[in-house]
Amino acid sequence: MKNNFDENKTPVVAIWETTQACDVPSLEYDRVQPEADPLELNTLEALQLIDEVGELSPPIFVLTGADPLKREDIYELVQHASERGLHPFLALPATPLLTPAAIAELKHAGLSRLILNLDAANPELHDLVCGIHGSFDRTMEAIQWADHWKLPYQITTHFCERNLHELENLAALLQTFRIKQWNVAFPVPTTLDELEKTPSAGEFESAFVRLYTLAQRVSFKIKTSEAPHYRRYVLQQQAKERGGLQPQGHQVQEGIPGILPFNESRGTLFISHTGDVYPCSALHVMAGNVRVASVAEIYRSSQVFTLLRDPANLTGKCGLCAFKGVCGGSRARAYVLHGDMFTQDPSCIYRPTEQAAVRNSVPRTLPSEKVAIEEP
């Protein structure tokens, strides 16, 4: 991705929740219902939405939902997105609807990448974490089907207290696959019960150490969701390896293109099944609805997006931090836990006042694609 990409005009990632319908309850998707919401976007509205996203032309367009295969028009929608030049990704749970025939039809429709979930290298632990019995085995089968049809795929892991120890085991298992990318999704608690089960800031930091080490060893890209402060850790480690930070704006590694940092405060948008638009799926502050205004108008002009894109609005230690230009903290986590989407991210252990000397030395770009950045 080019460093001059203007995230004020075009999101890096656009995500559309196609449906909340799913035949199988899941611990990782709390909005599941057996049948489609009567208010979800119909086929004509969905096609119009894809046209509008196509005009924005984000590098990444992800179709997600409880189970997108519950939509009878999903193959038509994937094909339309492909024809619009959007290179669609599709996230699918391991339900009975995930079959060899479904994989084949998605490939034929022009799907660019399949996203599958794997929360542990151990079948029993994976099924326990995701809440779908037998999902580990079906995911393994889906990987084989994707390989057969030469459909690129990536794996998402939901990091939680139950699988804290599994990162190395998962990386070893994923090395045996032909995956393009491993995305480690960090939790945003929405209830007190979830908060008690959420890894601590120290455990986040420990995971960063391990992910950075693994990124040097594996053949696929490792990226993160809801952990923008992993970029801060990466920059700190690479500064140590170089013996000091380079001047602001300098490439972090010579000869490797910088990657634009993005999160819900900059460069992403999420569209719900009913057309409501949010900065991301975890930040429930609505910016508009596609039935009322265009996606471009909402993303470029709504108060929610324009305020979040300005790092000067950050408060607490995130506002003081030298790394706010490449991080910005999780605005969703700040909002859920503090009721303020501009305050500090409680999952970060970094204390910016201790590093005031580097405040003007942090680059805006990131290094190798082998190193994690934010992505769905």
Predicted regions and their residues:
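Iron-sulfur (Fe-S) cluster-binding segments and ferredoxin-like electron-carrier domains
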Residues: 31-40, 284-291, 324-360
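Radical SAM/AdoMet-radical enzyme domain recognition
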Residues: 27, 35, 40-64, 71-203
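Short Fe-S-cluster ligation motifs
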Residues: 48-66, 309, 344-376
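C-terminal accessory region of radical SAM enzymes
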Residues: 203-251, 276-329, 333
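Short, small/polar residue-rich loop motifs at catalytic or cofactor-binding pockets
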Residues: 262-266
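Canonical Radical SAM [4Fe-4S] cluster-binding loop centered on the CxxxCxxC motif
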Residues: 6-45
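Short, acidic, Ser/Thr-enriched surface-loop or helix-capping motifs
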Residues: 176, 271-272
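N-terminal [4Fe-4S]-dependent radical SAM core
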Residues: 1-17, 55, 254, 374-376
